């Protein structure tokens, strides 16, 4: 991976976007993990690590992240029609109602937040329309703040991993130290996935996420739930 140079200003912006304190509701989603723990598929730190590594290697998060990159570029170039296209494309690519709704809810929350703290973004938000996927909203914010796209992608994947590890810590359960150890172990793969995703062409966008989709569908009727997905 190339060396990334950020000004203090840009570094602080991306830290804010990737923070678990960002009020977009990410903490309320497990992306099917709750069902996988309930069924006994994920029972430990090692099985959670295997699941997250598989998702980073060929799962739906790669598709989502690739669309984030394209939306960032469209925002920088002022290509609103392209931005709307990728928003619709990502909505169509969601395989379950829970996954689609979670992306829309987080995207809406982020755009509403940005509209209040950075009102000049409102015109971009309005041009995308509603519903807006979270990856699109994240891309708009990163581009508006002129954060390096590679840094933005790293932050996006790291934030995703942090959220699911936090869910795993609660559900399995795991200790906080185990969660941080797992996040550290995922760093090389997050870095590698970033390089791969940055180089993908449009006709190479694909994923293998049937496990996630089945878990998400089963979660919709799961009797006892802590999470919304």
Curated annotation (Swiss-Prot):
Chief localization class?
cytoplasm
Q: Name one GO cellular component term.
A: cytoplasm
Write down the InterPro entries for this protein, in alphabetical order. UreF, UreF_sf
Subunit composition? UreD, UreF and UreG form a complex that acts as a GTP-hydrolysis-dependent molecular chaperone, activating the urease apoprotein by helping to assemble the nickel containing metallocenter of UreC. The UreE protein probably delivers the nickel.
Question: What family is this protein classified in?
Answer: Belongs to the UreF family.
| Role of this protein | Required for maturation of urease via the functional incorporation of the urease nickel metallocenter.
Name the record gives this protein = Urease accessory protein UreF
In its UniProt entry, the species of origin is given as Trichormus variabilis (strain ATCC 29413 / PCC 7937)
User: Lineage from the top down?
Assistant: Bacteria, Bacillati, Cyanobacteriota, Cyanophyceae, Nostocales
């Amino acid at each position: 991976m190339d060396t990334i140079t950020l000004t203090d200003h840009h570094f602080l912006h991306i830290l804010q976007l990737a923070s678990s304190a960002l009020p977009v509701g990410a903490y309320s989603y497990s992306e099917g993990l709750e069902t996988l723990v309930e069924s006994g598929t994920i029972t430990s730190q090692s099985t959670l690590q295997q699941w997250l590594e598989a998702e980073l290697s060929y799962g739906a998060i790669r598709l989502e992240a690739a669309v984030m990159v394209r939306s960032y570029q469209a925002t920088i170039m002022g290509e609103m029609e392209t931005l709307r296209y990728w928003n619709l494309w990502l909505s169509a690519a969601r395989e379950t109602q829970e996954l689609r709704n979670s992306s829309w809810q987080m995207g809406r929350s982020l755009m509403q937040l940005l509209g209040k703290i950075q009102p000049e973004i409102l015109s971009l938000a309005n041009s995308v329309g509603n519903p807006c996927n979270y990856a699109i909203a994240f891309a708009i914010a990163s581009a508006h703040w002129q954060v390096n796209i590679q840094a933005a992608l790293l932050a996006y994947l790291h934030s995703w991993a942090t959220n699911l590890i936090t869910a795993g810590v609660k559900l399995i359960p795991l200790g906080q130290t185990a969660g941080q150890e797992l996040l550290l172990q995922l760093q090389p793969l997050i870095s590698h996935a970033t390089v791969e995703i940055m180089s993908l062409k449009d006709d190479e966008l694909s994923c293998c996420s049937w496990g996630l989709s089945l878990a998400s569908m089963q979660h919709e009727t799961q009797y006892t739930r802590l999470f919304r997905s």
